[in-house]
Amino acid sequence: MYEGLEDLKVDTVNRKTLAKQVIERIVHLLSSGQLRAGDKLPTEMELMDILHVSRPVLREALSSLETLGVITRKTRGGTYFNDKIGMQPFSVMLALATDNLPAIIEARMALELGLVTIAAEKINEEELQRLQKTIDDIANSTDNHYGEADKEFHRIIALSANNPVVEGMIQSLLITHAKIDSQIPYRERDVTVEYHKKIYDALAKRDPYKAHYHMYEHLKFVRDKILKGMDEK
């Protein structure tokens, strides 16, 4: 029997909270050393029996872990901790904070603000061209459907810093982009384009100070809008 799995409390707990508890128990297998990167997890039936949870709750938890790169589910092959998860502890931390959107937003701000200043020194012309394309895609989008182009804009900047230490962190964080994106109560395409243009101009001029300033203004705007929307629910 795996330690730390059998004590899940299910009384008067809603499904979302219960799924988070399941995530915590599964991650515990890794952090406690009972299982290691690349190891196979117990089957769904075994986990349901051990944790006393329904299949929908378990699958919601497993889906979150898979999205964040903590596990891989293979058809008819079972579920495994990813081979490189030991090199990406940030993915595990995000898995444990999936229901704490303000914390995820602030983590994203802290990371991206540092990366954009480095990007101002390292970004190349090809990456600048790709950035411009995302801005054009957003400007030309219909019905404000520009989530992927928005995500790509931030991904290009983050990876242009060319720092392998933080690359895994930003990739994990950007995976949560869709969750953050879904919390925006309404979109303002023209405002997004304006913010992105200012960031682009600062990067093109190799100005880390203005790049930092405009990225902060952009992310603060997004954060405040999301938090306001959450308060109104």
From Swiss-Prot:
GO terms for molecular function: DNA binding; DNA-binding transcription factor activity. Residues 44-63 bind DNA. Coiled coil: none annotated. Keywords: DNA-binding, Transcription, Transcription regulation. Residues 16-84 form the HTH gntR-type domain. InterPro entries: GntR_C, TF_FadR/GntR_C, Tscrpt_reg_HTH_GntR, WH-like_DNA-bd_sf, WH_DNA-bd_sf. CDD domains: WHTH_GntR. Gene3D superfamilies: GntR ligand-binding domain-like, Winged helix-like DNA-binding domain superfamily/Winged helix DNA-binding domain. SUPFAM superfamilies: GntR ligand-binding domain-like, Winged helix' DNA-binding domain. This is Uncharacterized HTH-type transcriptional regulator YcbG.
